[in-house]
């Protein structure tokens, strides 16, 4: 197969969903049926191939996105298995950035759950074409049709049903293929490897005809010629239907919906067929956005083997045998071992040593890789997640990834002073792997502080430090990552002057500080801090203005109320003055810091806290107690909906009130209720609570 043709035969896909919807089991079955795995790994037995970290096998959840390559028909499928737990959304985010398509797995009983919504929104952000697999159709309470309705209501998606289940719950035995209008039944004795087609039974004929008509109504809209044929009563062929399903999936006009039970080995092969038939190849995506380093011009670069080399590093992983591995998605060109490329973000050269194709945590050495491939590179020195590797002669920077701010922090210290250095090394390695995990030193106490996306996230970091780096640590109580902001605009004119013999220092700045919510035409709503210079006529020379921005950026890390980072504000430099001899970048940096300290208290500063969206699923009888408890935690109930024989309560609750909630919920519901939470937004802390927080600082 020539390299250029090869691109059309590649499918880079992610399998993503809510925790426990059955993503890892689905991936295991895919590996089994494509011949990559000789035995089926079960998640609940701790034997799943994709869950290769010790913690994952113990907890039965997927933490890091393992990448694996398999073949189906004549196509190469690169699969990234992503975690469904909310503390690991960063893994999902960076996987989606480099994928061409995704399979969203839904629990046939629970339907669309909170994390499913988060993942769906992330996929929307990166315009990832996707299809839906309604799993667990064999389980008590599974309802395919309700799940399809939830896709519309919860996600605002346009589902295109292309399969219907045959039998429900324990009698689920196969599917109706609405394209071929045939029933597919699996043989249990062959572990689902053998299946056969038969005619649709009479009792399901009407349902199948109804959904076939809905399918045709949606797909023929994409092609005038086929629509004319359909409206004139002519038969639309299966090939035409498949072509239009592919067209609509790639353009996100709709999302094909399939069903099955991965655990019971039913529905996986048609899912693989659909991945190959309907999800895009790199050539369907066609372009990747980036910037030409030489001109600074943003442009679209073609995805092609014949273009210069460009790749995005999307994950760093420490392998116990190979050391640090950098996973890259190659967008254009090709690369061979021994080549030198440039990291255009850091402006550092990197020599390509070992290149590996990964199957979960088994490795296969390769000498060459090209556009469309996902490979791991061993031994890169300066490359981190989100960096671009590029051809030295034609350097480009591909669109960067954005990572969320951590919402929870812990103080850690090694149990013995001898481990201090080891702990520092371990934490810096783990931070290199995971951009949503940060390490810093508290200036006042000298303590090491680790920050992450939730309690489980930090728990696993500490666990990995113990297992992989042999460092035992004492940990403090979890702390909330509070922030500060201003609520009204203020102006400050500050002059920094220092004369003490020899060279002096002089800088004058006039800055307007204002809340970001008051700023019109803000391109990125999520910007933490915006700086703008409106200096006209050289009141402050151009070369000194970066000093003002740097000073403000540094000083905003310690706010004026309780020393928490300041966010959601804009600083505009409107005037200033300089001295020919005594002014410098440093002098303007100092002046900006002092202006911040003096000006911010006039902006009516407020303390902000992270608010979490909490979803509790509970039997009816505990509803009252659970709502009462959420209200006592300063929660605001958003909605209450029935789901099967349970109730779903959605509330916005401050993170500070949610520590240890898992134990409270267990005792309130005798262990029958469950909850999940995701970060929603920052909001002002009520004044009486703010006083307590200030007193503690």
Curated annotation (Swiss-Prot):
Q: Which InterPro entries match?
A: EF-G-like_DII (IPR053905), EFG_II (IPR041095), EFG_III (IPR009022), EFG_III/V (IPR035647), EFG_IV (IPR047872), EFG_V (IPR035649), EFG_V-like (IPR000640), G_TR_CS (IPR031157)
| Cellular compartments annotated | Cytoplasm
Q: Where are the transmembrane segments?
A: none
Task: Give a GO molecular function annotation for the protein.
Answer: translation elongation factor activity
One BP annotation, GO: ribosome disassembly
Which CDD domains has this protein been placed in? EF-G, EFG_III, EFG_mtEFG1_IV, EFG_mtEFG_C, EFG_mtEFG_II
GO cellular component terms, semicolon-separated? cytoplasm
Entry keyword set = Cytoplasm, Elongation factor, GTP-binding, Nucleotide-binding, Protein biosynthesis
The answer to keyword DNA damage applying to this record is no
Q: Where is the tr-type G domain?
A: 8-283
The keyword Transcription belongs to this UniProt entry's keyword annotation: no
Which family does this protein fall into? Answer: Belongs to the TRAFAC class translation factor GTPase superfamily. Classic translation factor GTPase family. EF-G/EF-2 subfamily.
Question: Per its record, how is this protein called by name?
Answer: Elongation factor G
Q: Which organism is it from?
A: Rickettsia massiliae (strain Mtu5)
Lineage summary:
Bacteria, Pseudomonadati, Pseudomonadota, Alphaproteobacteria, Rickettsiales
């Amino acid at each position: 197969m020539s390299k250029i043709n090869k691109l059309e035969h590649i499918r880079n896909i992610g399998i993503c969903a809510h925790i426990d919807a059955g993503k890892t089991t689905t991936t295991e079955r895919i590996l089994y049926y494509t011949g990559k795995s000789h035995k089926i790994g079960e998640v609940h037995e701790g034997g799943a191939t994709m869950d290769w970290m010790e913690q994952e096998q113990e907890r039965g959840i997927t933490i890091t996105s393992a990448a694996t390559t398999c073949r189906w028909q004549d196509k190469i499928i690169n699969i990234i298995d992503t975690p469904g737990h909310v503390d690991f959304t960063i893994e999902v985010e960076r996987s989606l950035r480099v994928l061409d398509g995704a399979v969203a797995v839904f629990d046939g009983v629970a339907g669309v759950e909170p994390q499913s919504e988060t993942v769906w929104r992330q996929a929307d952000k990166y315009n990832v074409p996707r299809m839906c697999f309604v799993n667990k159709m064999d389980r008590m309470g599974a309802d395919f049709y309700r799940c399809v309705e939830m896709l519309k209501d919860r996600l605002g998606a346009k589902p295109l049903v292309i399969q219907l289940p045959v039998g429900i719950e324990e009698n689920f035995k196969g599917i109706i293929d609405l394209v071929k209008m045939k029933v597919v039944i699996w043989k249990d004795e062959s572990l689902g490897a053998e299946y056969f087609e038969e005619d649709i039974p009479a009792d399901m004929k009407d349902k199948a005809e109804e959904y076939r008509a809905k399918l045709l109504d949606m797909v023929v809209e994409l092609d005038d010629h086929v629509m004319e044929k359909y409206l004139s009563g002519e038969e639309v062929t299966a090939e035409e239907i498949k072509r239009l399903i592919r067209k609509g999936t790639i353009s996100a006009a709709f999302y094909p919906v399939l069903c099955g039970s991965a655990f019971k080995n039913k529905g996986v092969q048609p899912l693989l067929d659909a991945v190959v038939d309907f999800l895009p190849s790199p050539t369907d995506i066609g372009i990747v956005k980036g910037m030409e380093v030489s001109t600074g011009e943003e442009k679209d670069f073609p995805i092609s083997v014949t273009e210069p080399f460009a790749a995005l590093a999307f994950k760093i992983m420490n392998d116990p045998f190979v050391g640090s591995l950098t996973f890259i998605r190659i967008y254009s060109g090709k690369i061979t071992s021994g080549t030198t490329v440039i990291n255009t973000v850091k402006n550092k050269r990197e020599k390509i040593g070992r290149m590996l194709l990964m199957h979960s945590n088994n490795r296969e050495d390769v000498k060459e890789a090209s556009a469309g491939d996902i490979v791991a590179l061993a031994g890169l020195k300066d490359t981190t997640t989100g960096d671009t590797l590029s051809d030295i002669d034609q350097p480009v920077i591909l669109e960067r990834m954005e990572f969320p701010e951590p919402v929870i922090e812990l103080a850690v210290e090694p149990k013995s002073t001898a481990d201090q250095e080891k702990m520092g090394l371990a934490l810096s390695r783990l931070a290199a792997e995971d951009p949503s995990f940060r390490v810093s030193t508290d200036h006042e106490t000298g303590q090491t502080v680790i920050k992450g996306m939730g309690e489980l996230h930090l728990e696993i970091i500490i666990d990995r430090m113990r297992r992989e780096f042999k460092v035992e640590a004492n940990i403090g109580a979890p702390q909330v990552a509070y922030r500060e902001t201003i609520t009204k605009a203020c102006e400050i004119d500050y002059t920094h002057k220092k004369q003490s013999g020899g060279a002096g220092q002089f800088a004058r700045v006039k800055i307007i500080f204002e809340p970001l919510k008051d700023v019109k035409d803000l391109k990125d709503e999520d910007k933490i801090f915006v700086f703008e210079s409106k200096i006209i006529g050289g009141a402050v020379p151009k070369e000194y203005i970066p000093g003002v921005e740097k000073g403000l950026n540094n000083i905003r890390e310690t706010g004026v109320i309780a020393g928490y980072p300041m966010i959601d504000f804009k600083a505009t430099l409107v005037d200033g003055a300089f001295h020919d001899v005594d002014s410098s970048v440093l002098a303007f940096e100092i002046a900006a810091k002092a202006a911040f300290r003096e000006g911010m208290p006039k902006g009516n500063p407020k303390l902000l806290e992270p608010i979490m969206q909490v979803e509790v699923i509970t039997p009816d009888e505990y509803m009252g107690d659970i709502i009462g408890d959420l209200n006592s935690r300063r929660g605001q109930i958003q909605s209450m909906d029935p789901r099967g024989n349970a109730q779903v309560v959605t509330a916005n609750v401050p993170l500070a009130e949610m520590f240890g909630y898992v134990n409270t919920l267990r005792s309130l519901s005798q262990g029958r209720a469950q909850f999940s939470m995701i970060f929603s937004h920052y909001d002002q802390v009520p004044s009486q609570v703010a006083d307590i927080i200030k007193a503690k600082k």
